[in-house]
């Protein structure tokens, strides 16, 4: 995640939060909507497309790849995104028959935890960066945004349903 390189410099948050924390919950929302409407096979395809797009953007716009941390950020970001998103798709699919908010919330929370742990441990373990503190700040924002994303999920799910799904959303 390119945005993880930029700490939030407001309200003394630069030690505990990067802008990367705000982008992944949106990715989970998109995947969950696709999963609800089209099923897990299409949702997985969207994850793979997002992974390839992220890889291309990282190669084109990343900072300094001669820097070991930049390489670790790229590897950590790609690995975390792919594993967390695929897990999100699987968990969502298993919980899809529950009340409407259970699948997107639980899958996003599990995916966010996995994404955060994998990314920060791969990108920053052993580098001297205070990655544990950053990861907690990142995870707290992801949890908050996952809760907020239930609002657009609920609103958008009606649009998704109108496209042609016949199954009622609880």
Task: Tell me the role of every PLM-derived stretch.
Residues 1-38:
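Hydrophobic transmembrane alpha-helices
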Residues 41-52, 99-105:
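Cytoplasmic-side transmembrane-helix entry/capping segments in multi-pass membrane proteins
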Residues 17-18, 47-48, 108:
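Juxtamembrane helix-loop boundaries in multi-pass membrane proteins
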Residues 30-33, 37, 45, 52, ...:
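Long, contiguous secondary-structure blocks with strong helical propensity
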Residues 71-169:
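Membrane-embedded alpha-helical hairpins and interfacial helices in multi-pass inner-membrane proteins
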Residues 5, 16-17, 55-78:
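Interfacial aromatic-anchored transmembrane helix boundaries in multi-pass membrane proteins
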Residues 1-5, 57-65, 119, 123, ...:
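Structural signal for membrane-spanning alpha-helices in multi-pass inner-membrane proteins
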Residues 30-34, 59-67, 86-91:
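Membrane-helix exit/interface motif
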